[in-house]
Regions:
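Residues forming anionic-ligand binding surfaces in small-molecule and nucleic-acid pockets
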Residues: 6-8, 29-62, 78-103
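Structured beta-strand-rich cores of soluble
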Residues: 13-22, 27
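Conserved structured core elements
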Residues: 30, 67, 71, 92, ...
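Acidic, His- and aromatic-enriched active-site or binding-groove loops in soluble protein domains
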Residues: 51-77, 105-116, 153-158
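Noncatalytic alpha-helical scaffold of FAD-dependent oxidoreductases
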Residues: 15-19, 63-73, 80, 125-127
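Loop-rich catalytic cores of soluble enzymes, especially ATP-dependent carboxylate-amine ligases
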Residues: 99-105, 120, 124-216
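Secondary-structure boundary elements
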Residues: 23-29, 75-83, 107-108, 115-131, ...
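Single conserved hydrophobic/aromatic residue that forms the stacking wall/gate
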Residues: 1-7, 12
Length: 216
């Protein structure tokens, strides 16, 4: 099993991706901002649609009922070699967000899967249900998994300053936009995913912007 872990010289996934980036002379870092809801359970232990609180964006206790649970999640993440950076109540009732420090693409992908298992397990231990569904409550904000990408060449962040269309960073963004339909197979695999689009800070247009959160 250890041979399959990112960082091992025998990890085929890691070795193949590193070879491709080295050929291009690039280093890629990926950071995540993962949102989820915490719901109460009924007397039989089944999930309900009742959020654990009625707090809003960046609320604190007592309006934020998930503060201690998020702390347990972050401590567990650190014990498992992950690096949580920020934790706060999101805009939806019972909605939470935990951000993780950037790492390589494969390491980050593995961390996201581990993170979700940690959240579900700790929520269950506290008699709650954690949901990563994009739009669990029609009248509340949807949950996203924001992916922050950076490209480096010779130690320089290629996304700093003005980005020319014919630059490496410009070509990278053009590639993401050109393949946006294909990417939705992985980023939005459920019918429920599309109920989130077009609302609040969810994507609305296939374009890019430095500030507008409704851009893809």
């Amino acid at each position: 099993i250890s041979a399959c872990l990112v960082g091992s010289e025998m990890c085929i996934r890691d070795r193949d991706m590193n070879r491709k980036f080295k050929k291009l002379g690039l280093t890629c870092n990926v950071g995540t901002e993962c949102e989820f809801y915490l719901f109460e359970k009924d007397d039989r232990g089944r999930p309900t649609c009742i959020p654990i609180d009625f707090g809003g964006y960046f609320d604190v206790a007592p309006l934020d009922a998930g503060e201690n649970l998020r702390r347990d999640i972050c401590l567990t993440m650190e014990q498992m070699g992950m690096a949580p950076q920020h934790s706060h109540h999101e805009s939806g009732n019972g909605q939470n967000e935990i951000d993780c420090r950037y790492a390589g693409p494969l390491k980050t992908a593995d961390n996201v899967m581990t993170f979700k298992q940690i959240v579900r397990a700790i929520a269950m231990r506290n008699g709650l249900h954690a949901s990563f569904l994009p739009k669990p409550l029609p009248q509340q904000a949807g949950s996203g998994l924001h992916i922050n990408l950076s490209l480096y060449m010779d130690g320089k962040n290629l996304f700093e300053g003005d980005i020319a269309p014919d630059s490496v960073a410009g070509s990278f963004m053009a590639g993401v936009l050109a393949h946006s339909r294909e990417l939705t197979v992985f980023t939005n695999p459920l019918p429920n995913s599309y109920q989130r689009f077009g609302c609040d800070e969810a994507p609305r247009y296939v374009s890019w912007s430095r500030q507008n959160r409704s851009q893809l």
